[in-house]
């Protein structure tokens, strides 16, 4: 089945990473193009939903294009899984002072504050996910985390129960550790720090980030 295929591919990715045989190929490209591709493909697969792209900045970055697209697909797939049919899912590309921020927003059930710091763990599925019929093995966000951290980036999440979730991928414009067009092993996982706000903001949203 498609679910089993996805599980096998995810486990192979993690196995190659753990054995330090997973390579990144750094190339320069427009981050907007990757987001637009994910938007178009998602619209074809799930025509009942609306996929918007806003903000839509054109930002030249240096990264592994395939892996960055994989991150966006993981975030988009999750948004589709946990949102009501007919929802609007918004992808974003924004140029920042220090680089580029990619985002994915949904109107799903939201993630409880106490679970935000665990969603990037392997095989972890939050309580709201376990109560739905959505498929998933709890590996997607851990893979996204590995890829983002391998690019010296940061992965953030902002969520409110009943209002939806937004993921942010903050990336530098260049990768100092490898020359353009070169290959490099995806770095091994470090003991990442999960930072969770002790209080929700005025709008009731809680945030967490891994760095």
Q: What residue ranges belong to the model's regions?
A:
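Short conserved segment of the HATPase_c
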Residues: 111-123
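A conserved beta-strand-to-alpha-helix junction within the catalytic ATP-binding
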Residues: 25-40
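Short helix-loop "hinge" at the ATP-lid/N-box region of the Bergerat-fold HATPase_c
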Residues: 79-80
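Conserved catalytic submotifs in the C-terminal HATPase_c
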Residues: 25-28, 48-60
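Conserved glycine-rich
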Residues: 152-153
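Detector for a conserved hydrophobic position within an alpha-helical segment of the HATPase_c
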Residues: 147-148
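Acidic ATP/Mg2+-coordinating residue in the GHKL
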Residues: 106
